């Protein structure tokens, strides 16, 4: 059997529970045709780069699948008939990714809780520049400044 990564986008107005039900429907199709789903990742609701069928956001879900091509074809056919699925993409891969996907790792990296204060970064005045002149506010207002 071949290995696949399948990502589908569900409409923003369906609940997370309905997205889980969709995933279970896909699992049933795959398993009935002799395959299995190795991993399911729900990435949450994300903003789309452009509108798809009048939706600006969508639920993203990743499935790692080990199944024959006939099972994938049937799952894609059922997905395209479902009005809650906006887009889908299935890619054949050589090996399934172990652990979290890049999107889930990105979510963990976004915390940035341990960053120090950036401030002036410990730099002093630049020796290659002379000191700044004091600003003359009266001259700036006469010249039509803001």
Swiss-Prot record:
Coiled coil: none annotated. Residues 105-138 have a biased composition (Basic and acidic residues). It comes from the Bacteria. Keywords: Ribonucleoprotein, Ribosomal protein, RNA-binding, rRNA-binding. One of its GO terms (molecular function) is small ribosomal subunit rRNA binding. GO terms for biological process: translation. Pfam families: Ribosomal_S6. One of its GO terms (cellular component) is cytosolic small ribosomal subunit. Residues 100-146 are annotated as: Disordered. Transmembrane segments: none annotated. Belongs to the bacterial ribosomal protein bS6 family. HAMAP family: Ribosomal_bS6. Binds together with bS18 to 16S ribosomal RNA. This is Small ribosomal subunit protein bS6.
């Amino acid at each position: 059997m071949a290995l696949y990564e399948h990502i589908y986008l569900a409409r923003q107005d369906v609940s997370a529970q309905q997205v889980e039900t969709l995933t279970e429907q896909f699992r049933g199709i795959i398993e009935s045709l002799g395959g299995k789903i190795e991993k399911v990742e729900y990435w949450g609701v994300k903003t789309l780069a452009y509108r798809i069928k009048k939706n600006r956001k969508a639920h993203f879900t990743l499935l790692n699948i080990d199944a024959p091509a006939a099972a994938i074809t049937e799952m894609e056919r059922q997905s395209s008939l479902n009005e809650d699925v906006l887009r889908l993409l299935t890619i054949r891969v050589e090996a399934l990714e172990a652990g979290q996907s890049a999107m889930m790792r990105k979510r963990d990296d976004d915390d940035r809780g341990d960053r120090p204060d950036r401030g002036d970064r410990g730099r002093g005045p630049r020796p290659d520049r002379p000191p700044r002149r004091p600003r003359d506010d009266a001259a700036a207002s006469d010249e039509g400044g803001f």
